[in-house]
Amino acid sequence: MLEIKRVEVDEFWADSTVIEAGDYVFVGYCMANEGKSIEEQINGAIDVLEVRLNMVGLTLESVVKMDCLFKDIEDLNALPAVLKERFAGKYPTRKAYTSDFIREGIRFQIDAIAYKK
């Protein structure tokens, strides 16, 4: 069995936000700019995703799947413009969900899978 490497662990919440497993990297709980506009929260989440990918030598181009969690599914309308700007045509597959978040100011979060090879 290949080694599973937990790159970033959050002891408070008892989870790993970056895991390398085989040829894949799993990145969770990318969220930022709490209380700001949906565009700022989407960009902030992508910034966090980018930082976490850089921890394992990857970029946004290596992302193959994204789960996008929205407090209000109508905010999905803001996502394409930000993705076009940030992913420059190299888009991952994605799924959008609604979620109740733990704090009122959170409107968006990303979980992602990236490919290493």
Q: What feature does the model see in each segment?
A:
Residues 1-64, 70-117:
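N-terminal presequence-like segments and the immediate start of the first folded domain
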